[in-house]
């Protein structure tokens, strides 16, 4: 699905998810399913982690999906929320360009971006974060690095590190949670926050040098974190109710896969 394709329609779960629906059981086995939106994700890592658990998942971003998945909407998340809801769970990765503390010093120096004050773009980015946090979804996780979200909206519920989840990397990642528990470390590597990781120079800086794609490379969710989100949040059901389907019989609203 891309931004040029409008509308959503019901499709059978077994047609949409294929063998994933029936894996590990008979055709009549009833399983819990959640409808999940992964907002502002082009890599597909979080989407695919939840899909591997058998959930009904769509990602969206203004960029196309790197894996050319049919379960990606290239466009505005507001369109998805308005036309494809309700969702049980949303995980959002709002762009951090004008939010991260590492760049906020430019806001006080009169820097212009395409003729607009950078500080103005920070305000717009904060408004977008508020929109995501206040979306009509019972369970929400908003992810960002250390940013002005903490001082302008509220402090994060949790700050995690990739090396808690088996990734030899250091990157403080903040989570603002609604209706979700904190993530538990799954494979904490030896060391602490002072330990130099594979993605760092001896001075503690990120090894990725300046390039047009640096922001893109750094914005990908680490696989260990994506897997932990799917494993720990994928079994939760909003409102204490079980959302179940009967394989091959129940129909559910979803995006039409592109042809």
Roles of regions detected by a PLM:
Residues 2-259:
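Conserved active-site and SAM-binding loop architecture
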């Amino acid at each position: 699905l891309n931004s040029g394709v409008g509308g959503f329609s019901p499709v059978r779960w077994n047609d949409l998810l294929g063998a994933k629906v029936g894996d590990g059981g008979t055709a009549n086995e009833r399983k819990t399913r959640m409808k999940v939106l992964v907002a502002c994700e082009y890599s597909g890592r979080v989407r695919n982690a939840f899909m591997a658990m058998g959930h009904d998942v769509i990602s969206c971003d203004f960029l196309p999906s790197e894996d050319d998945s049919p379960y990606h909407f290239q466009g505005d998340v507001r369109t998805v929320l308005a036309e494809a809801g309700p969702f049980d769970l949303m995980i959002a990765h709002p762009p951090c360009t004008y939010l991260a503390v590492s760049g906020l010093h430019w806001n006080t120096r009169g820097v212009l971006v395409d003729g607009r004050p950078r500080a103005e773009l920070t305000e717009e980015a904060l408004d977008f974060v508020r929109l995501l946090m206040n979306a009509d979804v019972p369970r929400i996780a908003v992810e960002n690095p250390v940013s002005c979200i903490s001082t302008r909206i509220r402090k994060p519920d949790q700050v995690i590190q990739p090396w808690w989840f088996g990734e030899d990397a250091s990157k403080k990642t903040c989570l603002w949670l609604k209706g979700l528990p904190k993530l538990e470390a799954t494979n904490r590597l030896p060391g602490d926050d002072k330990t130099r990781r594979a993605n760092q120079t001896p001075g503690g800086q990120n090894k990725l040098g300046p390039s047009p794609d640096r922001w893109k490379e750094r914005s990908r969710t680490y696989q260990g974190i994506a897997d932990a989100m799917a494993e720990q949040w994928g079994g939760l059901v909003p409102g204490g109710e079980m959302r179940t389907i009967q394989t091959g019989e129940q129909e559910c609203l979803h995006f039409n896969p592109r042809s």
